[in-house]
């Protein structure tokens, strides 16, 4: 049986924490779509095309991972791609409350859409794209938190 999962997010930019989760999801499911949200309301630093390109570069060795951008409701995107599993990361209790609401809304919109929650590896549990960008803006060392191509792209954006 082929199990197709979607790991959605803004990924602005993709971090080692995201990469950890997509790698683990790729071992659990036959096919994983890393779905990058347009999220123009969040005012991302990187364009959707840039985020897709960076994600493709850092997931290239994961043969069952496909990277796609999207702007529609997640339930609609899942239907269009015949996926019925959403993979989400939970770093904290506050993440759980938000994810619980999203999971229930998605299930309301698409009853067969299940959410699977993965805990990040401990060393990535405090990392977020927003935090990494803030550290970079203030000249801090971001190399431990991002794949090399992403570090290079982020530093170029800030130059």
From Swiss-Prot:
Reactions that this protein is recorded to catalyse: (R)-4'-phosphopantetheine + ATP + H(+) = 3'-dephospho-CoA + diphosphate
UniProt-listed Enzyme Commission number(s): 2.7.7.3
Keywords: ATP-binding, Coenzyme A biosynthesis, Cytoplasm, Magnesium, Nucleotide-binding, Nucleotidyltransferase, Transferase
Cofactor section: Mg(2+)
Domain of life of the native organism: Bacteria
Coarse class of the protein's main subcellular location: cytoplasm
Residues that, per the record, bind substrate: 10, 42, 74, 88
A Pfam family this chain is assigned to: CTP_transf_like
Residues the entry annotates as binding ATP: 10-11, 18, 89-91, 99, 124-130
Site (Transition state stabilizer): 18
Molecular function GO terms recorded: ATP binding; pantetheine-phosphate adenylyltransferase activity
Keyword Iron in record: no
Pathway: Cofactor biosynthesis; coenzyme A biosynthesis; CoA from (R)-pantothenate: step 4/5
GO biological process: coenzyme A biosynthetic process
Gene Ontology, cellular component aspect: cytoplasm
Family: Belongs to the bacterial CoaD family.
Name of the protein described by the UniProt record: Phosphopantetheine adenylyltransferase
Gene responsible for this protein: coaD
């Amino acid at each position: 049986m082929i199990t197709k999962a979607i790991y959605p997010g803004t990924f602005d930019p993709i971090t080692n924490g995201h990469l950890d989760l997509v790698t683990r999801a790729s071992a659990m499911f036959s096919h994983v779509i890393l779905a990058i949200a347009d999220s123009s309301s969040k005012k991302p630093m990187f364009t959707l095309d840039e985020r897709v390109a960076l994600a493709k570069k850092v997931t290239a060795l994961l043969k069952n991972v496909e990277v796609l951008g999207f702007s529609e409701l997640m339930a609609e995107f899942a239907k269009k791609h015949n996926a019925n599993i959403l993979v989400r990361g939970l770093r904290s209790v506050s993440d759980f409350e938000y994810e619980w609401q999203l999971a229930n809304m998605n299930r309301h919109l698409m009853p067969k859409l299940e959410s699977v929650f993965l805990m990040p590896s401990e060393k990535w549990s405090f990392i977020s794209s927003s935090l990494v960008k803030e550290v970079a803006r203030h000249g801090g060392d971001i190399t431990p938190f991002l794949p090399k191509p992403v570090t290079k792209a982020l530093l170029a954006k800030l130059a």
